[in-house]
């Protein structure tokens, strides 16, 4: 199994370590590789789009020619997990809590609507407990950093976890989106669930 991690910015190393822990837990002989240009997508079984600044990630990905390639592969069934800014990249509808609708480059393959900076400056970073029973796990302590919120889901997209009634983890077929940072958690539950999607 070969998992790629988009490596423009964001927590590449933290995702790498969480994947290694999940591989070890499941006794998977897996490979993890950074993804920056289209040829890096060759022969991967799944891809992670980490957090960071979604507009920057989108612009760099578009300039390097990987944005359309990612969209095509994800549409064709490549398993993908987008965390925080990565979830924004996957959404079909994006707006900002302050400025409204945005025109940033998106992959746009998931039937969800996201509001950037949903929790505002007062809560730029916080930790809390969420219930992961819908993915067969227990409660988990997770980290939110300038987090967006998934405010609408349609089609086959479904909510897998909520915080105060707002979706923070969603899935649609081969696509997984989290508004928190699972790579900063003390549990590998989310990465394990992603590997479950990759294994099919």
Curated annotation (Swiss-Prot):
InterPro entries cross-referenced by the UniProt entry: Class_I_gatase-like, PdxT/SNO, PdxT/SNO_CS
Xref: CDD domains: GATase1_PB (cd01749)
Known catalytic reactions: aldehydo-D-ribose 5-phosphate + D-glyceraldehyde 3-phosphate + L-glutamine = pyridoxal 5'-phosphate + L-glutamate + phosphate + 3 H2O + H(+); L-glutamine + H2O = L-glutamate + NH4(+)
Gene Ontology annotations of biological process type: glutamine catabolic process; pyridoxal phosphate biosynthetic process; pyridoxine metabolic process
Lineage: superkingdom: Archaea
Positions with a binding annotation for L-glutamine: 52-54, 116, 145-146
Pathway: Cofactor biosynthesis; pyridoxal 5'-phosphate biosynthesis
Documented EC number(s): 4.3.3.6, 3.5.1.2
Active site: 84, 181, 183
Record-level GO cellular component terms: cytosol; glutaminase complex
Listed GO MF terms: glutaminase activity; pyridoxal 5'-phosphate synthase (glutamine hydrolysing) activity
Keywords: Glutamine amidotransferase, Hydrolase, Lyase, Pyridoxal phosphate
Disulfide-linked positions: none
HAMAP family named in the record: PdxT (MF_01615)
Family to which the UniProt record says this protein belongs: Belongs to the glutaminase PdxT/SNO family.
Subunit structure, as described in the record: In the presence of PdxS, forms a dodecamer of heterodimers. Only shows activity in the heterodimer.
Function: Catalyzes the hydrolysis of glutamine to glutamate and ammonia as part of the biosynthesis of pyridoxal 5'-phosphate. The resulting ammonia molecule is channeled to the active site of PdxS.
Family matches, as NCBIfam families: PLP_synth_Pdx2
Name by which UniProt lists this protein: Pyridoxal 5'-phosphate synthase subunit PdxT
Organism whose genome encodes this protein: Saccharolobus islandicus (strain L.S.2.15 / Lassen #1)
């Amino acid at each position: 199994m070969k998992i790629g991690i988009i490596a423009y910015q964001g927590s590449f190393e933290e995702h790498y370590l969480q994947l290694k822990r999940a591989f070890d837990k499941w006794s998977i002989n897996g490979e993890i590789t950074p993804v920056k240009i289209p040829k890096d997508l060759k022969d991967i079984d799944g891809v992670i789009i980490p957090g960071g600044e979604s507009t920057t990630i989108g612009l760099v990905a578009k300039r390097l020619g990987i944005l359309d390639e990612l969209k095509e592969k994800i549409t064709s069934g490549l398993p993908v997990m987008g965390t925080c800014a990565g979830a924004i990249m996957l959404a079909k509808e994006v707006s900002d809590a302050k400025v409204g609708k945005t025109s940033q480059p998106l992959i746009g393959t998931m039937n969800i609507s996201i509001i950037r900076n949903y929790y505002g400056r007062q809560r730029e970073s916080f930790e809390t407990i969420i219930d992961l029973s819908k993915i067969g796990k227990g409660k988990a302590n997770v980290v939110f950093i300038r987090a967006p919120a998934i405010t609408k889901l349609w089609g086959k997209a479904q909510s897998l976890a909520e915080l105060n009634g707002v979706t923070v983890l969603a899935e649609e077929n081969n696509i997984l989106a989290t508004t928190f940072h699972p790579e900063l958690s003390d549990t590998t539950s989310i990465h394990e669930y992603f590997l479950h999607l990759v294994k099919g």
